[in-house]
Amino acid sequence: QEYLSKRGFTPLSINRINNLTGDGIEDLKSNMLRSISIIKQEDPSEYFRMNVDRVFSKTGFGTIVTGTVLNGMISVGDEIEIFPAKIKTKIRGLQSHGGSAERVQRGDRAAINLSNIKTNLLNRGCVVSLPNIMKPTKHIIVNIMMVESTNWIIKNNQRLRFHFGTSEVLGRAMSTDKNKLERGENANFILVLESPVTITIDDKFVIRSYSPMQTIAGGVVLYQNAKGKWSKMKDFAKLMPIDSKERFNYLIKYLSNRPRSINDWKLLFFNSFNKVERWFKE
């Protein structure tokens, strides 16, 4: 509990049970129900998104992708797009939790049967979403937090392994302020990736060392399209707030020469879709 508290998690109860006698099971159930009642759920995005963890072909059906639905809902017959390849197709069939389904929604395990798509065009790490709403990128502004127990140091321009959703991508961490990041420290960086990823603002990710592979840090996406003159991007990234609402206001001021509609801001802040209108009013 102390370990979780130090890392921003609300510690829940620890329950001792006996599978043979059943002792403690009822207390565990009661504590689980009580915990569920106090957990605050974030407003989910209305846009569908699913990170693909498996791709395979089945005789008589064709290509199937599986994953856990992160946001939104889709139904049989809907048009979707698969990123970063930007392949558009329709849903031929759906399965969820072992049975056929007409639709799947946030939290469901889903198997999506795709129409007229070859298996070799897709891979683990792809993202299934609605057409034209996501943009793959190789330049990302992030905040990195080092694991407190690691002996590793992240230095400027260091090559690392980044895990976004179900994908692993190699890339380099470019410093905006500190030349190195040590255990327990955090700072804003610009990631320059070797292949495109499909992510959104406020997505979390894990960083592993290139070799030997060890988990050394985690992070959050602050802005997903850090293109432009390096000196300008560096200053832009260095001052970018971690808090979503503060970052929203920061971006409005910074991008004031390129006005966006409310819908554009909703797409940009994909995970905070339902908060954007409220932020505008505030």
Question: What feature does the model see in each segment?
Answer:
Residues 1-2, 117-282:
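C-terminal effector modules of nucleic-acid-centric enzymes and ribosome-associated factors
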Residues 2-150:
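Conserved catalytic-core segments of large NTP-driven translation/proteostasis enzymes
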